[in-house]
């Protein structure tokens, strides 16, 4: 055990950077490639359906079942062109991470064959088991289920062969079992209060959108070194060991050269950020070794 860290460090220095293939297209061409944004909605949905969906996204207007069926059909047509075979209601439970259950688009046709189908009913709501989430232990068996409901204000996106549908997740009793439900409630309350204030200066203000400022730094740790640190594994924080070198004493200063493995990671992150995270304005325009 006393030599574990030395062996891990030695192994880390021998690792080579991952090979990252740059897309043949320009960044502007694969921007939001795997996101069902408004441009793709306009292309794959009828005009009236597009208007109804954007109204639901912008103003929280309810969607009729027939409109949901049309939206689901358009989403499926776009997704299958990307090679998608499954869909999932994707949410962030109170137990951290993400939760998802992948279902295929296939249905029996009643004649011994199969057909690909994705209806508005499957898009809008599902009833997964909520037993493994903080849902209370004293309850009847039928109360173990939860409800996942599509949130039109967040973009649907594709990862690998799966269409990911952002949803909220609540218990049978209506209690929130995810992080998004309270966030949406908070945004609604902040927006309403902000509109009231803005109308003192401009009576025509109808809506105020709140944005979250993301932290700009991230830390990269070799997987082997990470596994050898119980404090990082259990808490995600450094709780033991020597203090880091300060005052730019080494060559890894504020404008230091970016290590090869780190540069490969940044390149891969840039590509995925443009393809997937572009609609929520997460991009990586700068490569910078921030050591301070």
Describe each region flagged by the PLM:
Residues 2-24, 141-162:
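N-terminal hydrophobic targeting/anchoring segments and the immediately downstream early-domain regions
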Residues 15-120, 124-140:
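Histidine/acidic residue-rich metal-binding segments in metalloenzymes
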Residues 52, 75, 194, 269, ...:
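Aromatic/hydrophobic pocket-lining residues that form π-stacking "cages" and hydrophobic walls in ligand
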Residues 61, 84, 203, 278-279:
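Short aromatic/hydrophobic-glycine micro-motifs
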Residues 67-68, 211, 283:
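Short, surface-exposed recognition loops or helix-turn segments adjacent to catalytic cores
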Residues 144-270, 277:
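ATP/Mg2+-dependent ligation/transfer catalytic cores
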Residues 163-165, 289-292:
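Generic recognition of long tandem-repeat/solenoid scaffolds
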Residues 280-291:
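Residue-level detector of conserved catalytic or cofactor/ligand-binding positions
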């Amino acid at each position: 055990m006393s030599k574990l860290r030395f062996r891990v460090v030695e192994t880390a220095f021998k690792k080579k950077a991952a090979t990252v293939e740059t897309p043949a297209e320009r960044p502007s061409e694969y921007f939001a490639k795997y996101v069902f944004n408004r441009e793709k909605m306009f292309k794959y949905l009828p005009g009236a359906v597009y208007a109804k969906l954007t109204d639901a996204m912008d103003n929280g207007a309810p969607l009729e079942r027939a409109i949901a069926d049309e939206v689901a059909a358009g989403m499926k047509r776009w997704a299958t062109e990307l090679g998608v075979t499954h869909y999932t209601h994707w949410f962030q439970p109170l137990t951290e991470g993400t939760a998802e259950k992948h279902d295929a688009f296939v249905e029996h046709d009643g004649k011994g064959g199969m057909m690909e189908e994705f209806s508005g009913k499957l898009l809008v709501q599902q009833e997964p088991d909520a037993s493994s989430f903080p849902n209370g232990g004293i309850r009847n068996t039928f109360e173990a289920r939860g409800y996942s409901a599509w949130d039109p204000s967040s973009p649907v996106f594709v990862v690998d062969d799966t269409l990911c549908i952002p949803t909220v997740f609540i218990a049978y009793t209506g209690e929130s079992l995810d992080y998004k439900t309270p966030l949406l409630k908070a945004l609604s309350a902040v927006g309403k209060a902000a509109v009231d204030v803005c109308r003192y200066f401009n009576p025509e203000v109808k809506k105020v959108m709140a944005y979250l400022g993301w932290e700009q730094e991230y830390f990269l740790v070799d997987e082997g070194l990470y596994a050898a640190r119980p404090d990082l594994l259990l808490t995600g924080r450094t709780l033991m060991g020597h203090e880091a070198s300060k005052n730019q004493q080494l060559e890894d200063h504020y404008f230091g050269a970016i290590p090869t493995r780190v540069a490969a990671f940044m390149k891969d992150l840039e590509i995925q950020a443009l393809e997937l995270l572009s609609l929520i304005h997460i991009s990586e325009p700068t490569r910078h070794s921030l050591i301070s």
